[in-house]
Amino acid sequence: MLSKIIGSVVGTKNERELKRMRKVVSKINAYEAAIQALSDEQLQQKTEEFKARHQGGESLDALLPEAFAICREASLRVNGMRHYDVQLIGGITLHEGKIAEMKTGEGKTLMGTLAMYLNAISGKGVHLVTVNDYLAARDAELNRPLFGFLGMTVGVIYSQQPPQEKVDAYQADITYGTNNEYGFDYLRDNMVFSLKEKKQRPLNFCIIDEIDSILIDEARTPLIISGQAEDSSRMYALINTIIPVLIRSKDEEANKNNEEEDFWIDEKNRQIEISEKGYEKIERFLIQVGELGENESLYSPSRLPLLAHVQAAIRAHHVFVKNIHYIVDDGEVVIVDENTGRTMPGRRWSEGLHQAVEAKENVEIQAENQTLATTTFQNFFRLYDKLSGMTGTADTEAAEFKSTYDLDVIVIPTHEPIARVDMDDQIFLTKLGKYKGIIREIQEIQAKGAPVLVGTATIEASEELSYLLDQEGVKHNVLNAKQHEREAEIIAQAGSPKSVTIATNMAGRGTDIILGGNWQSFIEDIDAVSPEEMARLKAQWQIKHDQVVAAGGLHIIGSERHESRRIDNQLRGRAGRQGDPGMSRFFLSLEDDLMRIFAGDRVVNMMRAMGLKEDEAIEHKMVSKSIENAQGKVESRDFDARKNLLKYDDVANDQRKVIYGQRDDLLAEMDLLEAIKIMHQEVYNAMINQFIPPGSIDDQWNVDGLEDELENEFKIAMPINDWLDEDRRLDEEGLRAKIIETALDRYHSRREQMGEKDAAQLERHFMLQSLDKHWKEHLTQMDQLRKGIHLRGYAQKNPEQEYKRESFELFQMMLGAIKSETVQDLSRVHIPTKEELEALEIQQRENAAHMQMQFEHSDIDNMDGGVERAAVQSRNVVGGATGASVAGAMAGSSDDADPYAGMNISRNAPCPCGSALKYKQCHGKI
């Protein structure tokens, strides 16, 4: 109440910001007359002038008014489009590192060019992020003439892009690409073996288009690069056969505590719980098929993977539904994005869920994966020096944008007042009754001559509605994940008179629906269009446009409410662009998931008590309020889940920064000798401590054990007993110093044999190999720790604090293991010739380039082991972090692959690699 009173007196924060920015707009407009008088050549020269002024110390803020005025004039000359004042305000918002909420059809694409041009003047690069490759390529081509006229280069990044082409795209002044590709390129850049292989420049300025979709809807989406793990396809197929005989509880809440059923489902969180009866039934089956011993249970530590298979299979059968959560296309299970209705080819759920769905659908079961590198969108985009974004719907999530990303949301006024009318929801008893109501509404709208866009939440709902419309003889188009190839064509004509388009959620988002249809799409199909033909087509379109406007514009029908108000607002926002008329209304039923799971019993009982017929609807404020409360609960739950994920990922992110920083140092540092010396001292000290404890007397020393360990681990023979016999005054400190000095002397001697350059190359390869190997293992350990950490709460411990403590301990152990393995490898290495070094480096790159990896996402991570990931597969990853490396091929201890496996070598013979070890102790080691 107090904030409202203060706001009415001094204005809201948004109003104050707009007032400040309008003063800047006045400065921009003051340049217009003088700039209009410039020739094209003079206008183009301004970019070089701005660059010189900026290098001379003038800030981008100071350049903004004139630079925006130049960009606006250039846009008018090149594209025939002049930025409105509200678009200038949006450009200022983006430049200041804020989020511009601009309604659909108000020109976000054109608005973004202002901030992109200004920030490209610094020469540090600007990244424009879109939700899919089509929009990235479309917007790049749309704006390339403008930026080219102004002397700015434009690049586009995409998956499977040739390496040099991608480097060139990142070197451009302005780069377009998807959030996935930027994130995966960041991870790939931190898996390369030389700085020359890196693609990205330091992350400078980023504008995210549809920022709510990327930083809110996909915030719980870890980006994961993974390699293949062991094949468990047989197990998934086996487990799949038992699921149909398990009995699901009919009333989840009422039966949660009885043992009559085998399992029940928490629909809100998409989790399953198995009863004791269910466990016994599953165990009996597994014992019968020989997968479980007579005295074993699913709770046995060694059998926990089996339990995970079972849980994944139950979720696949009873939580994940075909044509809602996924489709089967050409023998593959393809995930459907629930927020957009688009398919996500190549992405895969993790934790065995995707394999379980493949078994359920009886298609080929693909292998699971092991994580090699990972980050989240939340942490990746926070790496940019300046982050901004634009969308039509951000204000409802303003608090989350501020708390998570420190981003303010500025609501940009519309150029023309919004003429769309948003009608009250209509609520029906059943889904069929709701569909009948929707069809009646469509027929009434069609009779007026207006177009209709029907938004559905799932593919299944779109096909059900399509079937019913066919029965009624209503011509229509369907746009869902199965018809994505025709998306642009369908959306282009969705504003034509009497057209009916059914679309899953926000399919087609990013493309405006023009009243009367898009007349320019007809021209694209004609090779050469005469001016007369163009005028005729435009006149025909104008007649249709006027007809649709007279009929009330585009009518939006929502077939159910989404869990998020923001998604509902996005659907409404498809109508009423730039002052056009329009209407929107949502149709609901008590059988809708949102109503069934979240709406209160009071609402349901009230509607049933009214004795409504199936196809009769009510409009009531109490029902609308109940729906809003349900959506608020879901949004709050999702916000908490994202906030919880960030707490845990921040721990991993700090470790990631350390590892990636060390990797960059290794790649950039020419001389690693000093670091190698320190490693030797630390590793040898740690080993000595095991046999000669600090502060101990000589009776407590295990000298024989130390000699054996030095020989076994580092292949160095030290006559420590002889040293002690020769010098009785040699104490613990002196002995420690002598051992380390001897080890370093030996290493220096071997280093001189190799030569400075080759030695440095070998040291770098060993350190990179060890770092990558142990980081990969550490990620797996962190993942396992994270899945079970919530159980610490039952022991009255804080899971978050426990996670921080244990992850730090794991990190320290990993760093110790990297140092120990590096010193060990350098001590055991065969000194190669220059030719061997070159040949092995080529082999390393070839192995890395052909190594199959996966690029993954996770849709849900609520810290209880219920993680779902989606993966994008790549066939060629240059600079992979594993495979036979130079160091591994030469070291006795780095023998991931045996290059001599086919040579029939005796296990007691010397190893062919020249390490002076027996084959069974070197490359033939099992």
From Swiss-Prot:
It comes from the Bacteria. Transmembrane segments: none annotated. It catalyses: ATP + H2O + cellular proteinSide 1 = ADP + phosphate + cellular proteinSide 2. It is a peripheral membrane protein. InterPro entries: Helicase_ATP-bd, Helicase_C-like, P-loop_NTPase, SEC_C_motif, SecA, SecA_CS, SecA_DEAD, SecA_motor_DEAD. It holds the Pfam family SEC-C. Zn(2+) binds at residues 911, 913, 922-923. Its EC number is 7.4.2.8. SUPFAM superfamilies: Helical scaffold and wing domains of SecA, P-loop containing nucleoside triphosphate hydrolases, Pre-protein crosslinking domain of SecA. Keywords: ATP-binding, Cell inner membrane, Cell membrane, Cytoplasm, Membrane, Metal-binding, Nucleotide-binding, Protein transport, Translocase, Translocation, Transport, Zinc. Its main location: membrane. One of its GO terms (biological process) is intracellular protein transmembrane transport. It is found in: Cell inner membrane; Cytoplasm. One of its GO terms (cellular component) is cytosol. PROSITE patterns: SECA (PS01312), SECA_MOTOR_DEAD (PS51196). GO terms for molecular function: ATP binding; metal ion binding; protein-exporting ATPase activity. ATP binds at residues 87, 105-109, 512. Part of the Sec protein translocase complex. Interacts with the SecYEG preprotein conducting channel. Has a central role in coupling the hydrolysis of ATP to the transfer of proteins into and across the cell membrane, serving both as a receptor for the preprotein-SecB complex and as an ATP-driven molecular motor driving the stepwise translocation of polypeptide chains across the membrane. HAMAP family: SecA. Belongs to the SecA family. Monomer and homodimer. Part of the essential Sec protein translocation apparatus which comprises SecA, SecYEG and auxiliary proteins SecDF-YajC and YidC. This is Protein translocase subunit SecA.
